[in-house]
Amino acid sequence: TKTLKNATKLNKGAKVFLHPVKNPKLYGIATIKNKKIINLKEKPLITKSNLAVTGLYFFDKQVVKLSKTLKPSKRKELEIVDLLNKYRKKNALKAEFLGRGGAWLDAGSIDDYYDTTSFVSTIEKRQGFKIACLEEIALNNGWINKVVLNESIKFYGNCEYAKYLKNLL
């Protein structure tokens, strides 16, 4: 989409994509004021916001350096929210909203995973197109040619995915 293509042009700072959710306690949540992220918290018990951090991020070249400064959280994990907060504190974090008409699905639990796979399967069957077929995206954008696509088809062998790719030729 145009929004994603614009995000790939990011030269400085970071960009995070947000989407409203019903149960903010299950996600990393952003609080926005005057179109700026003023707070980011992982799985907050109390929050005034319902804007989930979707897991779609764009970073500048500083991301590796900043990542190396992260410390494990109480959950003994390196948290993406901590990295995003480093950008926020430098006033270098931008937000983009995935609004109505788009689909963002979390697959953090077994039930969520089932719902996500069912959704993707239904859309693919009804429309006859794969969702996020990397070879198809690359071919359509001119990043690969049909020779490279043919190599992928050989790699995948005799499976449904390879048959789908053959139809792109």
Residue ranges of each PLM-predicted region?
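Conserved beta-loop-beta/alpha segment of the NTase-like Rossmann-fold superfamily
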Residues: 1-34, 58-61, 65-70
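Catalytic-core segments of class I nucleotidyltransferases/pyrophosphorylases
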Residues: 8, 36-136, 143, 147, ...
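Short, amphipathic C-terminal "tail helix"
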Residues: 143-169
